[in-house]
């Protein structure tokens, strides 16, 4: 297995992590409080036992395992497992991966992941979600989204958008995020 960079999402709609819960209003990587001692605990107390448990139960798995954690005191605690990457965490993790993602995926599929090294950009990444007015409750759909073509030196990830009449429009509560 390989461990990708840590990431933390921000779920609440309001400033200062207030208001209603959402699917994620943004994320950062690396996680400021996840120092080497803490990430070592994660690997030894959670990641290794998870991988070993899958092997012991004869459950072959090839792919991503996203482990959602909280920090209780100085201890990591699992709150969820997903067999996909998280959103919006992916949008701050993948841009930090300097290794060729296709090569990583091929190595996973071939069972040769142990033969590659992951090169990680040491710089931090932040993503902020743009959402429809009213989200996460009743929100507008169909309005045109403009201005993303003017964003420089950042990545724009679309989600909840569609192209209609040659224009990018809102089709869901979360529309895009910039990293």
Name these PLM-found stretches:
Residues 43-65, 82-151, 164-166:
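Active-site "cap" helix and flanking loop/linker of ATP-utilizing ligase/carboxylase catalytic domains
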Residues 9-12, 134, 162-163:
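Active-site/binding-pocket entry motifs
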Residues 71, 129-131, 158:
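Hydrophobic side chains in beta-strands
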Residues 1-90:
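Internal nucleotide-binding/catalytic subdomain
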Residues 27-30, 127-129, 175-179:
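Short, well-ordered beta-strand elements within core beta-sheets of diverse protein domains
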Residues 152-179:
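Internal helix-turn-beta structural module
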Residues 25-28, 145-148, 156:
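Short clusters of hydrophobic/aromatic residues that line enzyme substrate/ligand-binding pockets
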């Amino acid at each position: 297995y390989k461990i990708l960079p840590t990431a933390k999402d921000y779920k609440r709609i309001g400033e200062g992590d207030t208001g209603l819960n959402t699917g994620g209003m943004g994320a950062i990587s690396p996680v400021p409080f996840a120092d080497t001692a803490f990430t070592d605990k994660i690997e030894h107390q959670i990641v290794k036992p998870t991988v070993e448990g899958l092997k012991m139960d004869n459950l072959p798995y090839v792919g991503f395992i996203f482990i959602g954690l909280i920090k209780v005191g100085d201890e990591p605690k699992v709150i969820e497992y997903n067999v996909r990457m998280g959103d919006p965490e992916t949008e701050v993790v993948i841009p930090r991966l300097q290794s060729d993602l296709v090569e990583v995926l091929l190595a996973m599929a071939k069972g040769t992941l142990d033969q590659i090294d992951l090169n990680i950009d040491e710089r931090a990444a932040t993503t902020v979600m743009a959402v429809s007015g009213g989200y996460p409750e009743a929100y507008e759909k169909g309005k045109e989204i403009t201005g993303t073509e003017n964003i420089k030196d950042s990545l724009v990830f679309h989600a909840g958008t569609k192209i209609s009449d040659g224009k990018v429009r809102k089709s869901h509560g979360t529309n895009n995020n910039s990293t």
